[in-house]
């Protein structure tokens, strides 16, 4: 009795299609694949156009569905040329590892993507070696975001259950020193700087780093708005700029600068945070970042504290309160006070 030919049927969430000698563009192919009528929603399509050694183009395609799609028509994924009478029939396979297929069709780089890649359990198969390979690939990524995406696709268990540690570790691995700020005005354009401020700057910036004291003196400058104190403070050299609050995260705070500028940070807030560490130029201390691990601060650099007069803003008014007498005595040993009565410049173009 003759045997019946085996009926074509593939039941899978992930399909791997190969179109040999297919001259269609990636864009035309994607449009036709998106238009296919299926009972299961499509979630992700990735197309790679590759040239054979003989110059003939072919396409690799990964299609991911929301659930399992049962394909019983081997011509279902055929593509049609819009300009001539030609059909392109693919080799159809169930993608056992969507991550492996995605990596494979990425190899030539000429790709087109629609939707969001869906991670599945088989994407992380292979045990320790696969995990190590994925970790190495993540370390070689060009950015934290790219590294996280690699881990999400290839080691989803670690992404799900160890995200907090991953996020913190990748922040350190891909840490970039903040770009140096370029002042719009040179320090020499400030022609009305009080002698106390000028002398403080010369005593610190006029020396090499080796000749500076272990814990240099800071300076607290109080003055009205638009007197130029911020621009002057920021024009002296490489610095950290802390405005309104303290953000000592490594993405914005650098251990490679010469001083800190603390601008419009209320004295009550600074007292609760790191008054003595910052104003006292203390070395090698830690700060706890919200939702992150403690950050090690190298320290040993002075701070220029800028404030306005009046209750709530003035450091003098704050320290003159009886309950702050011990802190006042400490601060007088670690910082100079300067009170501005006029702008630091002559031109009306500079203000802060």
From Swiss-Prot:
Q: Quick one: which residues bind ATP?
A: 223-230
Segments of this protein annotated with the region Oligomerization? 157-177
Swiss-Prot/TrEMBL domain comment: There are 3 rolling circle replication (RCR) motifs. RCR-2 is probably involved in metal coordination. RCR-3 is required for phosphodiester bond cleavage for initiation of RCR.
Q: Where is this region: Binding to RBR1?
A: 144-154
A Pfam match is Gemini_AL1
* Domain CRESS-DNA virus Rep endonuclease residue range list: 9-117
Q: Name one GO biological process term.
A: DNA replication
What are the EC numbers?
A: 2.7.7.-, 3.1.21.-
User: Cofactors per UniProt?
Assistant: Mg(2+); Mn(2+)
SUPFAM superfamilies for this protein = Origin of replication-binding domain, RBD-like (SSF55464)
> What is the protein named?
Replication-associated protein
Q: Which GO terms describe its molecular function?
A: ATP binding; DNA binding; endodeoxyribonuclease activity, producing 5'-phosphomonoesters; helicase activity; metal ion binding; nucleotidyltransferase activity; structural molecule activity
**Keywords of this entry:** ATP-binding, Covalent protein-DNA linkage, DNA replication, DNA-binding, Endonuclease, Helicase, Host nucleus, Host-virus interaction, Hydrolase, Metal-binding, Multifunctional enzyme, Nuclease, Nucleotide-binding, Nucleotidyltransferase, Transferase
What is the source species?
Tomato golden mosaic virus (strain Yellow vein)
Q: Might you report a single GO cellular component term?
A: host cell nucleus
Where does this chain carry the motif RCR-3? Answer: 104-107
Function summary: Essential for the replication of viral ssDNA. The closed circular ssDNA genome is first converted to a superhelical dsDNA. Rep binds a specific region at the genome origin of replication. It introduces an endonucleolytic nick within the conserved sequence 5'-TAATATTAC-3' in the intergenic region of the genome present in all geminiviruses, thereby initiating the rolling circle replication (RCR). Following cleavage, binds covalently to the 5'-phosphate of DNA as a tyrosyl ester. The cleavage gives rise to a free 3'-OH that serves as a primer for the cellular DNA polymerase.
UniProt-annotated location(s)? Host nucleus
Q: Which family does the UniProt entry place this protein in?
A: Belongs to the geminiviridae Rep protein family.
Q: Which Gene3D superfamilies match?
A: 3.40.1310.20
Residue positions of motif RCR-2: 58-60
Organism placement in taxonomy: Viruses, Monodnaviria, Shotokuvirae, Cressdnaviricota, Repensiviricetes
Free-text cofactor note: Divalent metal cations, possibly Mg(2+) or Mn(2+).
For the motif RCR-1, what are the positions? 16-19
Describe its assembly: Homooligomer. Interacts with the replication enhancer protein (REn). Interacts with host retinoblastoma-related protein 1 (RBR1), and may thereby induce the transcription of host replicative enzymes even if the cell is not dividing anymore. Interacts with host PCNA. Interacts with host SCE1 protein. Interacts with host GRIK1, GRIK2, GRIMP and histone H3.
């Amino acid at each position: 009795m003759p045997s019946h030919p085996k009926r074509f049927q593939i039941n899978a969430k992930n399909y791997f299609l190969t179109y040999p000698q297919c001259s269609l563009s990636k864009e035309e192919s994607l449009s036709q694949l998106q238009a296919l009528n299926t009972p299961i929603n499509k979630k992700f399509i990735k197309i790679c156009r590759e040239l054979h050694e003989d110059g003939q183009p072919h396409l690799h395609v990964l299609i991911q569905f929301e659930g399992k799609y049962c394909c019983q028509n081997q011509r279902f994924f055929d593509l049609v040329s819009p300009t001539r009478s030609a059909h392109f029939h693919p080799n159809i396979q169930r993608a056992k590892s969507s991550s492996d297929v995605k990596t494979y069709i990425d190899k030539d780089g000429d790709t087109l993507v629609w939707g969001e890649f869906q991670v599945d359990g088989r994407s992380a198969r292979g045990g320790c070696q696969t995990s190590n390979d994925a970790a190495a690939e993540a370390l070689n990524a060009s950015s934290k975001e790219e590294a996280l995406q690699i881990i999400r696709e290839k080691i989803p268990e670690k992404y799900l259950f160890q995200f907090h540690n991953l996020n913190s570790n990748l922040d350190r691995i891909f840490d970039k020193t903040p770009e140096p700020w370029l002042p719009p005005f040179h320090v020499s354009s400030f022609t009305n700087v009080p002698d106390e401020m000028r002398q403080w700057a010369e005593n610190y910036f006029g020396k090499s780093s080796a000749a500076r004291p272990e814990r240099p003196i800071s300076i607290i400058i109080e003055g009205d708005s638009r007197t130029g104190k911020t621009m002057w403070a920021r024009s002296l050299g490489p610095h950290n700029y802390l405005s309104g609050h303290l953000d000592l995260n490594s993405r914005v705070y650098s251990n490679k600068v010469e001083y800190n500028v603390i601008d419009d940070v209320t004295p009550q807030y600074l007292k609760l945070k790191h008054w003595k560490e910052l104003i006292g130029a203390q070395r090698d201390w830690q700060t706890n970042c919200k939702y992150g691990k403690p950050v090690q601060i190298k320290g040993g650099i002075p701070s220029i504290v800028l404030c306005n007069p009046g209750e709530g803003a003035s450091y003098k008014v704050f320290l003159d309160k009886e309950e702050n007498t011990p802190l006042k005595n400490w601060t007088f040993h670690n910082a100079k006070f300067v009170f501005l009565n006029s702008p630091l410049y002559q031109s009306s173009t500079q203000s802060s």
